Amino acid sequence: MCNDTATPQLEELVTTVANQLMTVDAATSAEVSQRVLAYLVEQLGVDVSFLRHNDRDRRATRLVAEWPPRLNIPDPDPLRLIYFADADPVFALCEHAKEPLVFRPEPATEDYQRLIEEARGVPVTSAAAVPLVSGEITTGLLGFIKFGDRKWHEAELNALMTIATLFAQVQARVAAEARLRYLADHDDLTGLHNRRALLQHLDQRLAPGQPGPVAALFLDLDRLKAINDYLGHAAGDQFIHVFAQRIGDALVGESLIARLGGDEFVLIPASPMSADAAQPLAERLRDQLKDHVAIGGEVLTRTVSIGVASGTPGQHTPSDLLRRADQAALAAKHAGGDSVAIFTADMSVSGELRNDIELHLRRGIESDALRLVYLPEVDLRTGDIVGTEALVRWQHPTRGLLAPGCFIPVAESINLAGELDRWVLRRACNEFSEWQSAGLGHDALLRINVSAGQLVTGGFVDFVADTIGQHGLDASSVCLEITENVVVQDLHTARATLARLKEVGVHIAIDDFGTGYSAISLLQTLPIDTLKIDKTFVRQLGTNTSDLVIVRGIMTLAEGFQLDVVAEGVETEAAARILLDQRCYRAQGFLFSRPVPGEAMRHMLSARRLPPTCIPATDPALS
């Protein structure tokens, strides 16, 4: 490939590399990069190729991949990490390069030639260095070495610039994915793990066969509200930040610390221990966390109430353990605070509600005591109602109308979730069919949630197809929503079930996107249509920069995989405007409407759009 003009061979070279890099993620980046380098060595007739990334914080360039792999690498490896401040003139030029650089044997490159000779044992080389550029920043280097002299033609360098751009895109995508994963598992204020990471950790620790018991310490700051009221929420946040640091400083070993939100923290000791064995640790924490904290010129002291509980692997769930520890912390707080309490059976009064639900739920399904309400989905640009999500409520015989969070987890634990799902699907399709028969909602999408068990239950796909057909609905007007965690429980079966559902014609959405453990990899393999951004990333848009980063990352992923996006939990005009700026046009949330009964939803569909007062002002360019 030595012509000065673009050739079909060079075009094929770029296309082949683009195809190989298209689906690269963090897990496959190194392997695929090395494979591409090997291909480029063969096609360009050079001896060595390498990929380096710039570390701007350290002002250094780091070796990411090379071909062929070197044998007998010196220790330390002179090529692994090179600081630009100490680099030879050739590498120094690459820190900010924006165009390809060619180096041939000449006096000006003697230092570079010496470095290559030390690493490769070759005295004379010709090289091309092609920068990876993102925006105005040089983020890395794609390099090629020919032992001996070689002329580099303009057409080759242009093709390599295109390939370097592809590598820069992979670099940015992998970095965004890593950042997204970090933000999804960490608390933005303290840097501690968040609830999602805590539950994942407890899932592993409480799995059958793991060593136990597993202790949990639930820490609840006493009277933090007084700091917020007196000094403001910024001071309260600063106090929480210092408090979190002190928890870490007080511990020895690899214990996991998580912030659940507000003034609540959970500590899981790394070693197995009973609640009684964990009590001395809790008391030591209580004493050490009393130290004075200087905030805004004020010297503050706050005590902490700590609840201690333990769970047995294979017998208790993360929810069981955290509920017990929470109940114990509540008992410590009710005792006046600044104390430690160990969970006892007497604290489990809330378990009565669960027993009550287990007793009455099956009868509630059979006796038609369930109710459907609907949450409208709107187009943020116009206010048009473009969909509705069916949500179930239960008219309990003694406790009144219960939200799904009160009884769906119980339904799943006693194998009633499937029966509950089928009731919701039948009732929602029936009501939606009635609306369409009245000339309403023909352009709207009916969204229905699917529980974990359904995707691995035989006959579910046939039931969906039969139900939709019996009510005369177009399958494309129905969207089934699943969560990421539902899928990863049995990925193989879930993937097969979703593929069959797509054959039926229904849409598939990943609900609560961003809160699971395998979000990125799922997008490559599952037949889905839509991502629903979890409300925890939407509610504070406009005040929480970390949430904005996550939303941007999700929008980028959706665009890359050609998926629709719906934002959940839109409660403020600021959040709606930010979503519009990010080109997320479909949304649900209390800003537009709370869940409403079927008759009210019918009236909304008849009106076709929300009142103008419910829709944020938009940029005409986004309409």
Swiss-Prot record:
Q: Which PROSITE patterns match?
A: EAL, GGDEF
Q: Where is the GAF domain?
A: 28-171
A GO cellular-component term linked to this record: plasma membrane
According to the lineage, what is the superkingdom? Bacteria
Which parts of the sequence belong to the EAL domain?
A: 354-609
The Gene Ontology terms for molecular function here are: cyclic-guanylate-specific phosphodiesterase activity; diguanylate cyclase activity
GO biological process assignments: cyclic nucleotide biosynthetic process; cyclic nucleotide catabolic process
| SMART domains listed in its UniProt record | EAL, GAF, GGDEF
**Which ranges form a coiled coil?**
none
Q: Where is the GGDEF domain?
A: 212-345
Check the record and name the CDD domains matching this protein.
Answer: EAL, GGDEF
Q: What is this protein called?
A: Uncharacterized protein Rv1354c
Please tell me the species this chain comes from: Mycobacterium tuberculosis (strain ATCC 25618 / H37Rv)
